[in-house]
């Protein structure tokens, strides 16, 4: 699925993106294209993670693409010395197993608990990002941030509604 033309068209109506935005769709499980995609970028925003409607038979079908894709994007951002790497993580990475209303960088969801493949994937991918950065010499690190929204929704940019929007549609129809 090539969502780039629809996304570029939508965003260009909202803000001036001419020569300022590159949208890349890459395979989370393959090395091809990551370094080229980050070349010349000041910022890399990683928004991809598998979201499935039904629990997979093997949770690694969701966990591995999330972790591996995130690390591929991060390594390419580091190699290309971007100013900042932004990971769209999830409340799932920090919010389960705590009895509180406010969360900070010390709170983590325990992926060993029975919390579902998607929730595990977000916790494990974000932890992998921070662990990778911490493993590097200070001089090789880049600025990174993870955002942890509870839900990301918006207008569909193509005929493919996407899983998040499909959940909302099903709830509105009373079929979820």
Language-model segment annotations:
Residues 113-144:
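Active-site Tyr-X1-5-Lys
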Residues 3-68:
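NAD(P)H-binding glycine-rich loop region in Rossmannoid oxidoreductase-like domains
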Residues 1-4, 91:
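Residues in the short beta-alpha loop(s) of Rossmann-like NAD(P)-binding domains
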Residues 11-18, 134-137, 170:
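Short, conserved catalytic or adaptor-binding loops enriched in Gly and charged residues
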Residues 8-10, 97-101, 156-161:
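Short aromatic-enriched loop/helix-cap "lid" or pocket-rim segments at secondary-structure transitions
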Residues 46, 50, 55-118:
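Conserved Rossmann-fold NAD(P)-dependent oxidoreductase catalytic core, especially the SDR/UDP-sugar
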Residues 136-176:
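NAD(P)-dependent short-chain dehydrogenase/reductase
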